[in-house]
Every structure is written in C-alpha cells, then in structure tokens.
Regions:
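RecB-family 4Fe-4S metal-dependent nuclease core
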Residues: 1-239
Length: 239
C-alpha cells in the first residue's frame, strides 16, 4: 500500500497478456470455483466469455490509470465508518454510518474515492438537495460515494474527490471518473473538493435520519414502483 504507480509499470503490465490472464484465473479460482490456486478447473462456454469480458475490463481500467499516472495507490476494499447521534422524540440514538470503498488513490493533494461500476451511465445530479428528494432518477450511487467522501473529509487532510468509475466507459482519452454536478443544459462542475458540499450533505443526511427514526412520521411506501424491482425488502412489504 501507499505505492506510487508509474507509467512504466502499467505499460509493462498492459503488454503482458499472460500475467493479466493469470490475475483473472486467480480471481475465478478464489471467488467462483472456490478451489486452491494449485488446481486447474475447466471453464465452460459462459465462463470463458465472462473471463474474456473481465480481461477486457481490466485492460480498460489499466489504460485509464495509465493516463492518470503517476499517482499513489492508497488502498482497496477499505472499510470506513463514523459514529453519529440521531435526535428522536424519545432521546438520542447512537448509530454508525459507513461502508467499503472500492479504491483510494491520491495525486497532487487530492484523494480520490473510487467506486467501480460495470454497467449503466454516469449520473449527474443537479445539486446536493436532489440526492435527498424522492424521484425516479435519484442517484443512489452518487449518494453512497458522497457519504464516503463526507467521512473521509474528517479523517485526513487532503481534498476529497468522489468518483464513480464506469469501467465500460473508461476507454476514451478524456474520461474522468470524478462525479460531476449541474443543472440540465448547463455546464457541469466536477466535484474535485467535496468540502464545498460537505456541510449541506451532512445537514440533509441528519434530517433524513431523524425522519427515519421518528415514530411520529409514518413509514410510507415509495410511489415510484420501478424502485421496487431490485429492492431487498420487497418480500416484507409484499409489493
């Protein structure tokens, strides 16, 4: 960890097809086949296709990183959390917010919080308020990454740039994963220093949590039925 990643290292890796495929095979053995690294499981047709797609994504990611070099790799699969207090009519509840950040890297005084995505398109919320307003196209991904950014702003001194890296979009020369905000049909601003938005985000988050834990505010189903399609809790509400 805290390794400086340079252009030469990534170029050498990009040109080493055997090593890249080895990385993919190691992951398949560990996470899919659940076998030791000494074994050589046979891939069926679908698994071969998946392996090829992952290998291509890996190359696109490395090419995107190559354009960003040199940078410092800070960590991956990094758990972050923060203790919070929530006011309720019955007193204060102590709770905790947090999650796992896919990747952290730093360059020129900026810490990027990177969440990987393998499908869909980048969301561009108009403002912080929109993340807390029920809507069909509200960006849960941006909300999650902003939450991590708010936590990291208080844990270290660097500027924090929340980023969503859509791997299938990363091949273009000008691609940047840093989240952008702005009204439709107006210029978009990259969120390169989250501290500008942190206070508003935290204030709105506090209000949201207090509403959730307030027994006097009814817990109602969303009116946007499409949101229920992939909801983990639809077996409870029977929608």
């Amino acid at each position: 960890h805290n390794n400086v990643i340079d252009k030469e290292t990534l170029e050498a890796l990009l040109h080493n097809e055997v090593k890249l495929q080895d990385y993919v095979d190691v992951a398949f053995k560990e996470l899919f086949f659940n076998v030791s690294q000494d074994e050589k499981p046979e891939y069926n047709g679908v698994q071969l296709i998946n392996s090829a797609v992952i290998s291509r994504y890996l190359k696109q990611l490395l090419e995107n990183d190559l354009r960003y070099t040199p940078f410092t790799f800070v960590g991956s699969e990094q758990p972050v959390q923060e203790d919070i207090e929530i006011k309720t009519p019955k007193g204060i509840i102590k709770s905790r917010i947090g999650g796992i950040i896919d990747r952290l890297d730093s360059k020129d005084g900026t810490l990027r919080i990177v969440d990987y995505k393998t499908g869909g398109d980048a969301d561009t919320p108009p403002n912080v308020e929109s993340l807390f307003t029920p809507a069909k196209k509200r960006s849960n991904y941006v909300f999650q990454t902003f939450l991590y950014a708010a936590i990291m702003c208080r844990k270290q001194p660097l500027k924090v740039a929340p980023s969503l890296l859509y791997i299938h979009r990363a091949a273009t020369e000008t691609y940047s994963p840093v989240i952008q905000m702005g009204e439709s049909r107006k210029p978009k601003e990259p969120v390169e220093d989250f501290s500008i938005y942190e206070t508003e985000f935290r204030e709105r988050l506090q209000v949201l949590l207090e509403d959730i834990f307030n027994p006097e505010i009814p817990f109602t189903q969303t009116e946007i039925v499409e949101k229920c399609t992939y909801c983990d809790f639809k077996t409870l509400c029977k929608r």
